[in-house]
Design a protein with these regions (language model features):
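An alpha-helical support segment within catalytic cores of ATP-dependent transferases
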Residues: 1-5, 117-166, 170-171, 176, ...
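ATP-binding glycine-rich phosphate-binding loop
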Residues: 4-27
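ATP-binding glycine-rich loop module of kinase domains
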Residues: 21-47
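Conserved kinase catalytic-core helix
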Residues: 60, 87-125
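Short pocket-lining segment of the protein kinase catalytic domain that shapes the ATP-binding cleft
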Residues: 79-87
């Protein structure tokens, strides 16, 4: 078994906190950050997956912070990565300067389109459509009719071989000077870009009224919805985005189904997912 360097956390200072974990900096190693995932995500299996994915994405030419090594912090596993100086996520920029919301939506659109046009390594990364096919067999508390509706739509999706992020949202692209970097790549894969866009739609519209979501993204409901409107207009080049919104709503439903591929939902989460799946099917598949 490989020996990993043991880190003394007392020599490090907490630097930031995100959805997956906490980052630390050290005066002794000023050009790197230590990232410790939250409980359940600090196993060697998960951290090595993050490490391997980051290295593979970098080889594709996608702008990401360099990851250097896997380390131990007590019994947990963590990573040492490049410290991107003076960084801010699009979420934080929108929070600090609400007047830039539309501009940041255009930034996400621009860099999203670059990502979606990049050819992925299909020998390393998973097909999002294949993941969806598996997840549709796992999803619970939905009717046979609704499962059939989703399967029929899933069969129409082209299995594209271009990149998708997997957690495409304002917190996962950071700015440093004039440069932008993608972060949190553990769900990276290939497929139709609408998988990523549906995820963004889910956050900015369906989940926007939730206080927990607002806290994560540092934006209130109205600002999240405004971000989506600006993104949709930038992405389509049109003022009337109703058809695009409708398609994104369909993929938002599939994004919830995909949770069964990416995690092991609790009973409460399964019921939460089922409620929103049913609501989205009524609105975007049957409406």
């Amino acid at each position: 078994m490989e020996n990993y360097r043991q880190i003394d956390l007392s020599a490090w200072t907490k630097f930031g906190e995100g959805g997956n974990g906490v980052t630390y900096v050290s005066l002794d190693e000023p050009d790197v950050i230590l990232k410790i995932n939250k409980p359940g995500l600090c196993t060697l299996e998960f951290v090595k997956h993050e490490y391997d994915v980051s290295k593979a994405v970098e080889r594709l030419g996608i702008p990401v912070p360099k990851v250097y090594e896997i380390v131990r912090v007590g019994d947990d596993y963590a990573t040492i990565s490049e410290r991107v100086k003076s960084k801010k996520s699009l979420s934080r920029i929108c929070c600090d300067e609400p007047a830039l919301t539309e501009a940041m939506a255009e930034v996400l659109c621009e860099h999203g389109k670059k990502l979606f046009s990049a050819q992925c390594d299909t020998q390393i990364f998973p097909s999002r459509k294949a993941q969806l096919t598996r997840a549709l067999e796992k999803v619970r508390f939905i009717s046979k009719k609704n499962r059939r509706i989703l399967k029929e739509f899933a069969r129409t999706i082209e299995d594209k071989t271009t990149c998708v992020h997997g957690d495409f949202q304002t917190g996962n692209i950071i700015r440093s000077g004039e440069s932008y970097f993608w972060i949190d790549l553990d769900r990276f894969g290939y497929g139709d870009p609408m998988f990523d866009i549906g995820h963004l739609f889910l956050i900015c519209n369906v989940y926007a009224p939730m206080k927990q979501v607002q806290d994560i993204f540092h934006m209130g409901e109205a600002q999240l919805r405004s971000f989506w409107v600006a993104f949709a207009r930038a992405y389509t080049g049109e003022e009337d985005c109703s058809a695009f919104d409708h398609l994104a709503g369909k993929f938002a439903c599939l994004d919830i189904v995909l949770r069964y591929e990416f995690q092991k939902p609790s009973l409460a989460e399964k019921l939460f997912f089922a409620f929103h799946i049913s609501h989205l099917i009524k609105r975007y598949y049957l409406g």
